[in-house]
Regions:
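Sec-dependent N-terminal signal peptides
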Residues: 3-18
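N-terminal targeting sequences that direct proteins away from the cytosol to non-cytosolic compartments
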Residues: 49-50, 120-170, 219, 241-243, ...
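A short acidic-to-branched-hydrophobic micro-motif
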Residues: 59-71, 163-196
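Short, exposed beta-strand-loop hairpins at the edges of beta-sheets
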Residues: 89-92, 99-114, 239, 252, ...
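Short, non-transmembrane amphipathic alpha-helical segments
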Residues: 69-92
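Polar/charged, Gly/Pro-rich intrinsically disordered segments
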Residues: 20-66, 92-133, 217
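Start-of-domain marker
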Residues: 24-48, 70-74, 136, 142-146, ...
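Signature of long, low-cysteine stretches enriched in small and polar/charged residues
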Residues: 124, 199-252
Length: 293
């Protein structure tokens, strides 16, 4: 199976030179693969029937012998081979799913579907707790959380950014700002129930972007403190380069402070996958002082 996969992957050079493949690109790629490999016999009871594309899914079809039996861990093996070859990352970044179909005498014997998000090698493990207590930018806030393993931990380079975790084009930042006054948790819950206030805040929060879109928002609790969770996307420019970015943010009202847990990255499949990690980090947040009794 590994040999078959590596042979097929030789025809994927087109992907390496494209930042983001459209459905039309994927269709053309499938036609190329089909033309090159159709009818190829691998000599082990498996021959190539063809390849085609459905939307963002590449479908590989094979003819197998009557006594062919799919390996017990065939899906795991296929994903492992895609990762080892380096093409899993390309599929993942371009949001390309793959499906493998095996036929005997035009009857489907086995079908394995692999979604693009299953092809990420991202690490979703968290490290040991770190605390911002005593940090000059923390403004007296006592907060601790678990950073993502394998990410670079740096000090914030702007006045209110306490710390940031970095991985390629992605970041998770801890930002602390002064609020206008002290608010109790009940007062904040009442404030966040005001739809006009929330909409105005979201409009202000996305104003630094061109063509901003608020993708979703909801009221949640972060370690018992009422918070506004929202995701937005839009366009921005840096040193002449235009890009579409996404941000996921938790705005936590903590007494007389506002804490922003802000995650950002390019609008791609990687950001979508990392949202799970961002949720895990935020769910690890603890405000220790509320338990000192």
């Amino acid at each position: 199976m590994r040999f078959i996969l590596l042979i097929i992957l030789l025809f994927f050079n087109l992907i390496s030179y494209s930042q983001s493949l459209s459905e039309s690109d994927i269709k053309i790629l499938a036609q190329r693969i089909n033309k090159e490999l159709q009818g190829m016999d691998f000599g082990n009871g498996i021959a190539v029937k063809g390849c085609y594309a459905i939307g963002r899914t590449l479908v590989y079809q094979y003819l197998v012998s009557e006594d062919w039996v799919a390996p017990e861990n065939i899906k795991t093996d296929l994903i492992e081979n895609l990762n080892k070859s380096g093409y899993a990352e390309t599929y993942f970044n371009n949001d390309i799913s793959v499906e493998y179909q095996y036929f005997f005498e035009n009857r489907l014997r086995e079908k394995i579907s692999i979604k693009s998000y299953e092809l990420t090698n991202l690490n979703f493990n968290l490290g040991e707790y770190i605390s911002i207590v005593g940090h000059p930018k923390a403004k007296g806030v006592n907060l601790k959380l678990k950073p993502p393993m394998g990410w670079q931990i740096e000090e914030g380079d702007r006045p209110n950014i306490v710390q940031k975790f970095l991985f390629k084009n992605n970041n998770y930042m801890i930002i602390v700002k002064d609020n206008v006054m002290f608010f109790s948790r009940n007062e904040i819950r009442e404030l966040l129930s005001d739809e006009e206030y929330v909409n105005q805040f979201l409009s202000d929060a996305s104003s630094f972007l061109s063509n901003p879109q608020i993708l979703n928002h909801r009221i949640v609790s972060v370690d018992k403190y009422p918070s506004l969770e929202f995701t937005l996307k839009g366009e921005m420019e840096r040193v002449g380069i235009k890009m579409t970015i996404k941000q996921k943010c938790w705005m936590i009202f903590f007494e007389d402070k506002i804490i922003y847990l802000q995650c950002g990255g390019l609008d791609n499949n990687e950001f979508t996958a990392l949202e799970k990690l961002y949720d895990l980090i935020t769910n690890s947040v603890i405000f220790p002082e509320q338990y000192d009794y």
